Amino acid sequence: MANIFIGNSIPPYRIDTYNVLAKMGFSMYFYSDRDPDIVNMDALLELCEFKPTYLQGKQLGRMSRTICFGLWGIIKKEKPKVIIVPEFQIVLWQILILKWLTCSKFKIISMCDDSYDMIANDNDFSRVHKWLRRLVPRLVDDIILLDVKAKDWYQEHFQKGIWLPILRNDDLESDKYRKVLPRSIEIAAHYGLSTTKVILFVGRLVKVKNVSGIIEAYARMTEHCKLVIIGDGEEMNDLQALASSISKEVLFLGRIEGEELRAWYNIADVFVLLSTLEPYGAVINEALLAGNRIVISQKAGACCLVSKDNGEIVDPYHIVETANALDRQVRMAGDKKEIRFRPSLMKVSFQERMNYLMQRLQRIRLGL
């Protein structure tokens, strides 16, 4: 007998959580053996402490619109007490129908990426998603949410909601950042950044990430620093043209992942995420674990990880406000005499959240 977890794919920022779920007795099922944002998937799979099983199905456009085959056979085999499903996707409705048709007793938990901004400011993916937000909580036993304010909203309206932000294992990540420090020192020397303050952005270069807003805010800053942009996407050429029009240098590095990316987090002093639509923003956890101070959009779910102790939350449409916040955070990062290992600035513990999840799942299994 095992519980069942169903996910889209295996992104690097969820590996630690998935490993814990497997240890808690979940069989791990996924739509795909590839994550569209990861190049070296084989290296990522080596970090899995479980054997993933890939579902057969028919994809109707995006991966999230997948009709899965053989679900009843899996349920009969595993005999689960709990099934965790992704968001409000087709597989949720398949599981609900199977439960109703067979009068099964297993509990259903949906993992939902809603940020509070999406809920409160009508900043949704679609009208359908907005409608489903009102329906699905009435049909499932609980909902796992990334944003603590979104969790509070679900608790208020449906008396359901488990806060589980995307977090990496603090201790494991600390060791990894320390391990790549020699590479960080080497890279910083190559680019002349050993004693220069660095503002870092990591992500897709698409409109909702508002990288143009970051460049415009950087142009208005008074503190001496360098903006480094890691990522690729459809806006690359336009962003490079914008960067060439300002009087400061912007370093575009393209797509980087794995240890090389960790090395850049060690080099950075301030991390910026200025998205206009961002359900969460897993990069914020990565940056905080590396000791980066944060300037984050109030639209991002991960702003629940940021306080005055480790950064600032800004309106992504206010460029002057963002520039001032970046100046303040660069100053608060202190003098930079060398590239060194820094303690984490995370205020939320991975193990604490996993222990909380374990307790909640036990209560759900018991029907409490």
Stretches found by the model and what they are:
Residues 255-256, 263-268:
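Short alpha-helical donor nucleotide-sugar binding micro-motif in glycosyltransferases
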Residues 293-296:
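Short hydrophobic beta-strand element within catalytic cores of glycosyltransferases
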Residues 276:
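Aromatic "clamp/platform" in nucleotide-sugar-dependent glycosyltransferases that forms part
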Residues 106-126, 141:
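A short, histidine- and acid-enriched strand-loop-helix "catalytic/donor-clamping" loop
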Residues 133-183, 193:
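Donor nucleotide-sugar binding/catalytic pocket of nucleotide-sugar-dependent glycosyltransferases
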Residues 308, 312-320, 327-333:
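Conserved acidic donor-binding segment of nucleotide-sugar-dependent glycosyltransferases
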Residues 93, 101, 126-143:
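Membrane-proximal helix-turn-helix segments that form the acceptor-binding/catalytic region
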Residues 240-256:
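Nucleotide-activated donor-binding/catalytic signature segment of Leloir-type glycosyltransferases, i.e.
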